[in-house]
């Protein structure tokens, strides 16, 4: 069961958040509709464990405590504030850098402050688990990301465009945008100069306007694809420019 939540960035709300100590990243995930459905489910059924996927759903912890006796486990996919701190560090002086500082500092306060509110934490890497243990006595284990290999058959090169480069990812996530922006401005001109026949394909949900309307030689902006695995098998080499990140880059594992 799913409840649709509007996660679009609203400029007015984002601006007003500058005068708040709350994390705008987290505030975007708060939904009255989702809260009502969650409470209904908790009242209708009993659970031993409620697993919260990422810190962005932690605002619902009080509702879970009130309507359930279940233990609450946080599944931590990343150390979220470190991603935004690194983006801030890679940004030149100016209004954008000041805004990014507000984002990562408010997110840090929330992320570290919420750790003691849960009964257990499942980090996605050992490194993340060690970091989190520095800030809480709550039990922490590291459980890596896994895939069902039967869903990823042995690749063949029958329908693969050789040579070709590609990137796939959610393009409404700023670290992905910043990585691609760097690759197109710093790396791609050199690649194209030496391999003028090579094409670079960009795929992913919520492709931003600057990519859809931009032009770079031999760069093909596809946008959302129906089958990510089929798309990856149709191209040769995956490009994953990382300027800021934490946890595990799932798409790299899937591409392997």
What are these regions (language model features)?
Residues 7-24, 28, 72-109, 170:
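Acceptor-binding helix/loop patch of EC 2.4 sugar-transfer enzymes
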Residues 38-58, 71-73:
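Short N-terminal targeting/anchoring amphipathic segment
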Residues 41-43, 114, 230-234:
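Structural alpha-helical scaffold elements that stabilize or flank donor/cofactor-binding regions
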Residues 71, 81, 100-154:
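Donor nucleotide-sugar binding/catalytic pocket of nucleotide-sugar-dependent glycosyltransferases
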Residues 119, 233-247:
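Acidic donor-binding loop of glycosyltransferase active sites
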Residues 134, 142-234:
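Conserved catalytic-core segment of nucleotide-activated headgroup transferases in glycan assembly
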Residues 229, 250-256:
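Short alpha-helical segment that forms part of, or immediately flanks, the ligand-binding pocket
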């Amino acid at each position: 069961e799913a409840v649709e939540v509007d996660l679009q960035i609203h400029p007015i709300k984002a601006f007003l958040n500058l005068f708040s100590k709350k994390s705008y990243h987290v505030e975007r995930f708060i939904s009255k509709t989702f809260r009502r459905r969650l409470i209904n489910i908790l009242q209708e059924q009993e659970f031993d464990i409620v697993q919260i996927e990422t810190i962005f759903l932690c605002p619902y912890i009080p509702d879970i405590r009130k309507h359930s006796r279940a233990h609450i486990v946080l599944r931590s996919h990343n150390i979220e504030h470190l991603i935004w701190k690194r983006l801030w560090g890679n940004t030149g002086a100016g209004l954008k850098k000041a805004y990014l500082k507000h984002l990562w500092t408010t997110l840090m306060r929330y992320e570290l402050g919420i750790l003691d509110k849960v009964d257990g934490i499942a980090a996605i890497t050992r490194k993340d688990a060690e970091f989190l243990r520095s800030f809480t006595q709550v039990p922490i284990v590291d459980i890596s990301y896994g895939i069902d290999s039967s869903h990823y058959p042995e690749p063949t090169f029958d329908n693969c465009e050789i040579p070709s480069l590609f990137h796939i990812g959610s393009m409404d996530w700023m670290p992905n945008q910043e990585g691609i922006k760097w690759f197109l401005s710093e790396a791609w001109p050199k690649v194209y100069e030496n391999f003028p026949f090579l094409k670079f394909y960009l795929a992913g949900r919520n492709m931003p306007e600057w990519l859809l309307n931009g032009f770079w030689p031999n760069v093909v902006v596809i946008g959302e694809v129906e089958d990510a695995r089929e798309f990856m098998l149709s191209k040769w080499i995956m490009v994953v420019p990382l300027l800021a990140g934490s946890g595990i880059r799932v798409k790299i594992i899937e591409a392997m």
